[in-house]
UniProtKB/Swiss-Prot annotation:
Pathway: Purine metabolism; GMP biosynthesis; GMP from XMP (L-Gln route): step 1/1
Job of this protein: Catalyzes the synthesis of GMP from XMP.
Record-given protein name: GMP synthase [glutamine-hydrolyzing]
Residues the record marks as active site: 86, 172, 174
Coiled coil spans: none
SUPFAM superfamilies documented for this protein: Adenine nucleotide alpha hydrolases-like, Class I glutamine amidotransferase-like, GMP synthetase C-terminal dimerisation domain
Domain GMPS ATP-PPase: 199-397
Length: 523
């Protein structure tokens, strides 16, 4: 399911940049649809996608390096607006007859550029900071291009050709370290390329609902596995809006959920969508499979395998209850655009990473996949969810791992330990919300060090309790993350409440590790 037919995409040509997906997100934040394609794409590939414009991403190479990624020169003859960024700026220069040289002045990090007119930087300070990351630099712009910015290490830090609707910058406008970067990118898209800003949550929701109707048809039936997370909830809400009670949502309670999550799905999701919901209580089955298991990967595998078996049983029940003569042919999944790109979808394929499929279903049950969110980024999914009327408690929910609290208990998972962690997690989430910090942090895993005991003093006696770890992080995409600097008074309140209210916990510690080197989750 794709939105290409309704929106001519701005194609982000990926030269191996870590920021290609981020560029695509920034284009969409400007209100214009975008997709990522590999640099190996040909002019015919671009024509086939009916592109509205091209953005050439950065990359780690020199344009003169052996095997450096190159651009099909015919693409620049298609008459499309083109915007080059960093390596893409240099590749564009090279292809159009300009000069890229090793000036001997590398620039990495925050750098001052001096602006000399032009559309891109109109209204900005004559000297302002941007984020650079380059060795080579453009020393001479292609014929017909006007140089509009320079820096100490880049004689040509930006250029424009309004007649050809082409422009480029040596720096990275897509990162937050370039404070005016979003404005510069938006000015290219609207002022130079002349594109309409019609990519909105309302339009997206309306188009996706119609496409689901087309795919499933007037009589088709579908099943959707709800995890309690944002993606499956929004996917389920979209499909329910499209086909009504021909959708059955299945929620497996594996006992590894946080406080209130089952109730949130059973009450809030159903109330907001009117969806038909089947809840399967598999708590004891999961606990029995996790008994004695302490190794993190073994936990994940045990939880994953048991979830498949639980979902199989739920699907069998739904199939049995389907009206006589009807079948359930479609499986709804919350696959997002980054999953499609990472699995090869950016090059025109439709591979889905295995962990996004419900594997292990019976051989005689074959579903056609319905993936209404496969063109969307996470922030867009949240916006669509709000447009569909889902409560903020669902659409604003922090990311939560599939194995749940099972991988936030360091040690064996038992019912008592789950209750301990669930209580501590609820306190932390409540205090962060009351302090107005939900919009500041990406997520805050709360971890129980169940195999560790620390000595403490509570009341008049010595205690040997477990430590709780708080792991608040800030991120845009979870690929990298920094620990969040929470106010001391909030940390104090969380710590005091947890050590006073949660049995067997006498210490709260703060994880101040960034990613890399540490991952967001402990297991």
């Amino acid at each position: 399911m794709s939105l290409q037919t309704n929106h001519r995409p701005v194609l982000v040509v990926d030269f191996g940049a870590q920021y290609a997906q981020l560029i695509a997100r920034r284009v969409r934040e400007a209100g214009i649809y975008s997709e990522v394609i590999p640099h190996t794409a040909t002019a015919d590939d671009v024509r086939a996608k009916n592109a509205a414009a091209l953005v050439l991403s950065g990359g780690p190479s020199s344009v003169y390096a052996e095997g450096a990624p190159s651009l099909d020169a015919e693409i620049l003859d298609l008459g499309l607006p083109v915007f080059g960024i960093c390596y893409g700026f240099q590749a564009m220069t090279h292809a159009l007859g300009g000069t890229v040289a090793n000036t001997g002045k590398r620039e990495y990090g925050r750098t001052d550029i001096n602006v000399a007119g032009g559309v891109l930087h109109e209204g900005l300070e004559a000297c302002h900071k941007v984020w650079m990351s380059h060795g080579d630099a453009v020393s001479e712009a292609p014929e017909g291009f006007v140089v509009t910015a320079s820096s100490e290490g880049a004689p040509v830090a930006a250029f424009e050709n309004k007649e050809r609707k082409m422009a480029g910058v040596q720096y990275h406008p897509e990162v937050l370290h370039s404070p005016h970067g979003q404005a510069v990118l938006t000015r290219f898209l609207t002022e130079i390329a002349g594109l309409e800003q019609n990519w909105t949550a309302a339009n997206i929701a309306e188009e996706l609902i119609e496409k689901v109707r087309e795919q499933i048809g007037e009589d088709g039936r579908a099943i959707c596995g709800l995890s309690g997370g944002v993606d499956s909830a929004v996917a389920g809400a979209l499909v329910q809006r499209a086909i009504g009670d021909r959708l059955t949502c299945v929620f497996v309670d594996h006992g590894l959920l946080r406080a209130g999550e089952r109730e949130q799905v059973e009450k809030d999701f159903v109330a907001a969508t009117g969806a038909k919901l089947v809840t399967v209580d598999e708590r004891q089955a999961f606990l029995s499979k996790l008994a004695g298991v302490t190794e993190p990967e073994a936990k994940r595998k045990a939880i994953g395998a048991e979830f498949i078996r639980s979902f199989e049983r739920a699907v069998a029940g739904v199939l049995e209850e389907a009206p006589e003569g009807s079948t359930v042919d479609f499986l709804v999944q919350g696959t997002l655009y980054p999953d499609v790109v990472e699995s090869g979808g950016g090059s025109g394929t439709a591979n889905i990473k295995s962990h996004h499929n419900v594997g292990g279903l019976p051989d005689d049950v074959e579903f056609k996949l319905v993936e209404p969110l496969r063109d969307l980024f996470k922030d867009e999914v949240r916006a669509v969810g709000r447009e569909l009327g889902l409560p903020e408690e669902i659409v604003g929910r922090q990311p939560f791992p599939g194995p749940g609290l099972g991988i936030r208990i360091i040690g064996e998972v038992t019912e008592d330990r789950l209750e301990t962690l669930r209580h501590a997690d609820l306190i932390a989430r409540t205090e962060l919300t009351e302090a107005g910090l939900d919009g500041v942090i990406w997520q805050c895993p709360v971890v129980l060090l169940a195999d560790v005991r620390s000595v403490g003093v509570q009341g008049d006696g010595r205690t040997y309790g477990h430590p709780i770890v708080l792991r608040p992080v800030s991120s845009e995409d979870a690929m990298t993350a920094d620990w969040t600097r929470l106010p001391y008074e909030v940390l104090e309140k969380i710590s005091t409440r947890i050590t006073n209210e949660v049995p067997d916990v006498n210490r709260v510690v703060l994880d101040v590790t960034s990613k890399p080197p540490g991952t967001i989750e402990w297991e």
